[in-house]
Every structure is written in structure tokens, then in C-alpha cells.
UniProtKB/Swiss-Prot annotation:
Gene behind the chain: Adh
Catalytic activity of the protein: a primary alcohol + NAD(+) = an aldehyde + NADH + H(+); a secondary alcohol + NAD(+) = a ketone + NADH + H(+)
GO MF term set: alcohol dehydrogenase (NAD+) activity
One GO cellular component term noted in the UniProt record for this chain: cytoplasm
Record GO biological process: alcohol metabolic process
Binding site for substrate: 138
Protein's name according to its UniProt entry: Alcohol dehydrogenase
Family affiliation: Belongs to the short-chain dehydrogenases/reductases (SDR) family.
Pfam entry (one): adh_short
Enzyme class: oxidoreductase
The keyword Repeat appears for this protein: no
Domain of life: Eukaryota
Keywords linked to the UniProt accession: NAD, Oxidoreductase
Lineage: Eukaryota, Metazoa, Ecdysozoa, Arthropoda, Hexapoda
SUPFAM superfamilies: NAD(P)-binding Rossmann-fold domains
Length: 254
């Protein structure tokens, strides 16, 4: 996918990996970058706008846990304004296994609902033009960090959902791939809670292992966007971008 002159919606593009990815996207010159985030960050929006004045950067407040109808209403506002959207990035995520319901609501249900909502505008069965979805999942969707089983399971669910979306592209006209960062130096991983406090030092122990910067992750994220491979499972770890070959142990046969 060519980022230049495209219209992109980025959910949770104002913090951590998201903000650095927004910076890299803006450098590539899209026509519009629409940021949907729970928390407003005027300084970051001003920075992004100044980084490339040719790009229109717009912000709308959005909590991915709102009812589906509210998400559809927000997307209608955006589509009415832009007319077309080329790429949706679902990036909302939390890491706190004390918050079981919210972890699932943000990391999985929010991705499902935002994706479901945009189908009203993209699905070729309704006369839509199709589109591209990039879902930020995690390497914990491959192999869990067992001390945070709720987080890991939510990311595995998001990965499975994304793989299914890719298989449905011939039906909907919407392609999809997953972005799976490894351990990245963000606020998210500096302090978080394990499930039932099974390992109080989980964040500290995790950071003893090699990590990557948010900039490294963001630069590889943009490479994945440009590659635009339906069904790709991208691992973004230790400053590298690698495709993952998914091992099939069972097939529904349909």
C-alpha cells in the first residue's frame, strides 16, 4: 500500500508505539491521518501537524469499549467528511491482569467492534470499495507470557480474529494483517500487574531481556503497511520485521 495521499484511521495512535508510528506515517505523506483515542494529546497532534504540513491530522475522542452503535456513528462522521478511507489501524491495548474484563474489552472486543463498524462502509456486498485493516496484536498471541494469561489470551484472540478477516477478504473485499510487537520500551511494560499477583516482579523480569525501541517498532510497522500482504502475521521484535509462518494443526474443511 502506498501511504502517500491515502486516508488512514488510527485507533490509539497518540501514545507509545502508536505515537511513533503516527510520526512515521506522517513522514510518508498521507492525505489524512485521523486519530481516534481515549485521551486527547494536543501537543502530540500539533507536533504531527508540524512534521508534515501537507498532511491533515484530525483527532476524535474514542473509547473502544463504547457500544457498537456509537462506533458506527463516529465512523459515519469520518466517512461523511473524507468520503473514502484506505486503512484502519486498530491499536488500542492495555496490560494489567488485575483488570480482567477491561483487558478483554479493550484488547479484543474493541478491535472486533471497530472492525465490525467499518464494514458498513467497506463491505463489497453492500457496494463498498473494500479496505485494509492492520490489527496490532502481540507476540504473546504466539506464545503467552504465562504470568499475564488474560493479556496473552486477549492478544491471541485478536490474532485469530485477524487471520479470519484475511480469509474472508474474497467475501468482504476487506484485507487484513496483524502487527505483533515483541517487548518494546514503553510505559506499558515498565509497570504492570500479573494475574492474581503470581509474579509481582513480572515487569522487572521482562525488561531484563533484550527489547526494542518504539521508533524501531514504528519504522517496521510502516514497512508492513507498505508491504500490504493480506493474511500476513508480522513479528516486530528486536528491531526486525519478520513474517511468521502459521502452523496449521486443524482445518474446518469449509
Amino acid at each position: 500500500m502506498v501511504i502517500a495521499n491515502s486516508n488512514i484511521i488510527f485507533v490509539a495512535g497518540l501514545g507509545g508505539i502508536g505515537l511513533d508510528t503516527s510520526r512515521e506515517i506522517v513522514k510518508s505523506g498521507p492525505k489524512n491521518l485521523v486519530l481516534l483515542d481515549r485521551i486527547d494529546n494536543p501537543a502530540a497532534i500539533a507536533e504531527l501537524s508540524a512534521l508534515n504540513p501537507k498532511v491533515t491530522v484530525t483527532f476524535y475522542p474514542y473509547d473502544v469499549t463504547v457500544p457498537l452503535a456509537e462506533t458506527k456513528k463516529l465512523l459515519k462522521t469520518i466517512f461523511d467528511k473524507l468520503k473514502t478511507v484506505d486503512l484502519l489501524i486498530n491499536g488500542a491495548g492495555i496490560l494489567d491482569d488485575h483488570q480482567i474484563e477491561r483487558t478483554i474489552a479493550v484488547n479484543f472486543t474493541g478491535t472486533v467492534n471497530t472492525t465490525t463498524a467499518i464494514m458498513d462502509f467497506w463491505d463489497k456486498r453492500n457496494g463498498g470499495p473494500g479496505g485494509v485493516i492492520a490489527n496490532i496484536c502481540s507476540v504473546t498471541g504466539f506464545n503467552s507470557i504465562y504470568q499475564v494469561p488474560v493479556y496473552s489470551a486477549s492478544k491471541a484472540a485478536a490474532l485469530s480474529f485477524t487471520n479470519s478477516l484475511a480469509r474472508l477478504a474474497s467475501v468482504t473485499g476487506v484485507t487484513a494483517y496483524s502487527i505483533n510487537p515483541g517487548i518494546t520500551k514503553t510505559v506499558l511494560v515498565h509497570k504492570f500487574n500479573s494475574w492474581l499477583n503470581v509474579e509481582p516482579r513480572v515487569a522487572e523480569l521482562l525488561l531484563e531481556h533484550p527489547t526494542q525501541t518504539t521508533v524501531q517498532c514504528a519504522q517496521n510497522f510502516v514497512k508492513a503497511i507498505e508491504a500490504n500482504q493480506n493474511g500476513a502475521i508480522w513479528k516486530l521484535d528486536l528491531g526486525r520485521l519478520d513474517p511468521i509462518e502459521w502452523t496449521k494443526h486443524w482445518d474446518s474443511g469449509i
